[in-house]
Amino acid sequence: MKPRHKRAAIIAGGLAALGIAAYLVLNAFQSNLVFFFSPTQVFAGEAPKNRAFRIGGLVKEGTVKRDNLTVAFVVTDTAKEVPVSYTGILPDLFKEGKGVVAQGKLDENGHFTATEVLAKHDENYMPPEAKAALDQAQIQKTIKSLK
């Protein structure tokens, strides 16, 4: 084999290996990608059904119902509400009226079943996505009240 052909074969093999590696990385990234939605976006049908995503907002006052390890509550962004159920131990900082981000799936009836629940960790912190969703919902609420 001539040196030029050998070099071309090595370059072609390297490019093929690089392409396969890039495909595998992107495929793994896509399967682990979890999007964030506010209750308003979920209510509008923007969230996927039967696919994992995160929902964030505030735990609505008076909606937490406990039954052993199963907890049902409502997440709100002050404009819309989504019922959530979770089986497991909640974080110590989980409280009504406080910020929460839950990861799970939405069923056909609009009920969110969480596999993980995260609570804010001090009085000044709220996840950026949840803060932005609450601010957007408040703006929409203000605009509607002005009309």
UniProtKB/Swiss-Prot annotation:
One of its GO terms (cellular component) is plasma membrane. Residues 29-147 are periplasmic. It comes from the Bacteria. InterPro entries: CcmE (IPR004329), CcmE-like_sf (IPR036127), NA-bd_OB-fold (IPR012340). It is a single-pass type II membrane protein. The keyword Glycoprotein does not apply. GO terms for biological process: cytochrome complex assembly. GO terms for molecular function: heme binding; metal ion binding. Residues 1-7 are cytoplasmic. The chain crosses the membrane at residues 8-28. SUPFAM superfamilies: Heme chaperone CcmE. Heme binds at residues 121, 125. Keywords: Cell inner membrane, Cell membrane, Cytochrome c-type biogenesis, Heme, Iron, Membrane, Metal-binding, Signal-anchor, Transmembrane, Transmembrane helix. It is found in: Cell inner membrane. Belongs to the CcmE/CycJ family. Heme chaperone required for the biogenesis of c-type cytochromes. Transiently binds heme delivered by CcmC and transfers the heme to apo-cytochromes in a process facilitated by CcmF and CcmH. This is Cytochrome c-type biogenesis protein CcmE. The gene is ccmE.
